[in-house]
Amino acid sequence: MSESCPCCSGLQYNACCQPYLTHAATAAEPAILMRSRYTAYVKHDVDYLIATWHPDLHPEKWRESLTESCQNSQWLGLTILATSPGKIPDEGYVEFAARYISEIDSQRTEVMRERSRFLRQHNRWYYIDGVHLQTGRNEPCPCGSGKKYKKCCGQ
C-alpha cells in the first residue's frame, strides 16, 4: 500500500504527486504544480524543484540553497488557500500556507504564506516567483485549525 501524499490532498502518493516527481506526468494547472513542488521539498527532490522553476530564471544557481532548505526543514502540511488566473491566459497564481519546523532557527512550528506566480510555456507550467504574505494576528490561522492566528501558529 502506498503512503499518503505529503501535499495533504488526501490521495495516496502514487496516485497524486509521485507521477510528477518521477516525470511520468506534467502538472495540468498551477495548483497541481504547487502541490508537487511542496512534495519535492518534503522528499528533498531538489532536481524536481529546479526542473519546475522557469529556465529563464537560471534555477540551477539556487541548488545549494534549496538543498539546505530541504535538509533543515521538517515540512508538516500544505493548505492551498486560493487559486486565480493571471492577466494573460498562460499565467496563474496559487496562494498557499505551508507549515514547517526549521531545525536551524527554532524548534517551533512556523507558517509560510505565499502567493506564487506560475507561467505556462510549451504546454508546461513553471514556478516564476512568489510574494510572502503576512497573516494578521486576528485573522484565521492559515493552517486551517479554525483558531485565530495569534492563538495558533502565531504564538
From Swiss-Prot:
Question: Membrane-crossing residues?
Answer: none
Show which residues constitute the signal peptide.
none
The record's listing under HAMAP family reads:
UPF0225 (MF_00612)
The record's Pfam families line, in alphabetical order, gives: SEC-C, YchJ_M-like
User: What name does this protein carry?
Assistant: UPF0225 protein ECA2332
Q: Which PANTHER family match?
A: ADENYLATE CYCLASE-ASSOCIATED CAP C-TERMINAL DOMAIN-CONTAINING PROTEIN, UPF0225 PROTEIN SCO1677
Q: Which NCBIfam families match?
A: PRK01617.1, PRK01752.1
Q: Which family does it belong to?
A: Belongs to the UPF0225 family.
